[in-house]
UniProtKB/Swiss-Prot annotation:
Sequence repeats mapped onto the chain: 208-232, 251-275, 326-350
Record field: transmembrane: 380-400
Spans annotated as 3 X 25 AA approximate repeat: 208-350
Species of the source: Thermotoga maritima (strain ATCC 43589 / DSM 3109 / JCM 10099 / NBRC 100826 / MSB8)
Keyword Repeat applies: yes
Protein name: Outer membrane protein alpha
Record-level GO cellular component terms: cell outer membrane
Job of this protein: Links the outer membrane to the inner membrane. Long fibrous protein that could serve to separate the two membranes.
Subunit architecture: Homotetramer.
Name of the encoding gene: omp-alpha
Length: 400
């Protein structure tokens, strides 16, 4: 009776597949069996018009749909509920990587904003420099006109003032060179940081692509194991059909061995479930820790941006004070030079602080990348252990 029911079920599946399979996949195509197998298991269901479109490139959305159906199939047919936790872990891991990629993109935007603000500050400094030169030239021309009127009366005073103006011009040139050098160093640091961040983003994308390859490899291995299992089931059914009476007699003889084998399989299944739960907890803890660390990095970058904005506002206020004092006489210009020296010291201090913050963020990002790489190694070890245990179960079944 069981054989009749099994035959009817197989015929119903076969004829339903014949009438509902993709019409654009010919039977003589080299991939016909593979496509049919995926369609039969509900992994590939085709497009709304009922065709498979095998020559069309697959999109990331379609790949995600196929992988999701594959995980559902594994959960229902292969692991009897045990792989549901593994599928959830893989899904959570994918969500975490997407969130991580969004945060990295946000950090890139923040760095671009900082670079734009520094460029604006540099332009403001250039404009201030031009205005200072114009006012110095105007003062110089005015003084020279006064000197021309009184040169015959006080030649010594004229020479002293000319010497002071020359010293002031040289001091201003030195200050200009120092400011230009500092701005160039800041631009180089920003360029290096953008390049390094681009490399980190490329590494993260490589890690995501690596997980996609792992999922494809898992699918290929499961398909291979499933095909081998189907072949062995078919061979077993054929042997059972020829030796039904012999097996019935041997069941009583080997009943104890069968019970022992069942107990071993149950123990292996229990151990596998325990390892999966332990691995899930460990991965969840690591992912939560990485997320907290990335939030800290993001907060520090926001603080750095706020401090830079405050410093830029302070620099603009000092520029306004410089513009007011330029209209004064020689002593006021000397005082302006003293303020410029103080501003240069402040700029050096802020530059050093910015470099330290950039190095700190860089070190933290490198630590996060190492943590992600360590997690990938642990996931590869877990995958190898899973298929190793599955292979032992298949060997035990085939041996009996």
């Amino acid at each position: 009776m069981k054989r009749v029911l099994l035959t009817v079920a197989m015929l119903s599946v076969f004829f339903s597949a014949m009438f509902a399979f993709f019409p654009d996949v010919p039977k003589d195509h080299w991939a016909y069996e593979y496509v049919w197998k995926l369609w039969q298991r509900g992994i590939f269901i085709g497009y709304p018009d009922g065709e498979f479109k095998g020559d069309r490139y697959i999109t990331r959305y379609e790949a995600a749909t196929a992988v999701s159906r594959l995980l559902d199939f594994i959960e229902q047919k292969m692991l009897a509920g045990a792989s549901g936790d593994l599928a959830q872990v893989v899904g959570n891991l994918s969500d975490k990587y997407m969130a991580l990629e969004e945060k990295v993109n946000g950090l890139t935007g923040i760095l671009d904003t900082l670079a734009s603000q520094i460029g604006t500050t540099q332009a403001n400094l250039t404009e201030t420099e031009r205005e200072l030169l114009e006012k110095i030239d105007a003062v110089k021309e005015e003084i020279e006109m006064e000197f021309d009127k009184e040169i015959s009366l006080n030649r010594e005073v004229v020479n002293n003032i000319g010497l002071k103006l020359g010293n002031l011009s040289r001091d201003y040139e030195r200050y200009k060179e120092n400011v230009d050098a500092k701005i160039s160093e800041v631009n180089e640091k920003l360029a290096a940081l953008e390049k390094d961040l681009g490399n980190k983003i490329a590494d993260l994308e490589g890690i995501v692509n690596l997980h996609e390859k792992d999922i494809i490899n898992i699918y290929n291995k499961i398909s291979s194991v499933n095909e081998e299992l189907n072949n062995k089931i078919a061979a077993t059914e054929e042997k059972l059909s020829r030796k039904d009476e012999e097996i019935s007699a041997m069941v009583e003889l080997h009943e104890k061995d069968i019970i022992n084998l069942y107990n071993k399989v149950a123990a292996l299944n229990e151990d596998l479930n325990k390892k999966i739960l332990d691995t899930k907890a460990e991965l969840s803890a690591k992912i939560e820790s990485q997320e907290k660390t990335l939030n800290m990095v993001y907060t520090k970058l926001l603080d750095t941006e706020s401090k830079l904005n405050d410093e830029i506002s302070a620099l603009k206020e000092k520029d306004a004070e410089i513009q007011k004092t330029v209209d004064l006489h020689e002593q006021d210009i000397v005082n302006l030079y003293g303020k410029t020296s103080s501003l240069e010291e402040d700029l050096n201090m802020k530059y050093n602080e910015t470099n330290e913050k950039i190095d700190q963020v860089k070190a933290e990002l490198e630590d996060k990348i190492e943590s992600v790489k360590a997690y990938n190694r642990n996931l590869s070890i877990l995958t190898g252990a899973f298929f190793g245990i599955l292979g032992l179960i298949l060997i035990a079944i085939s041996g009996k």
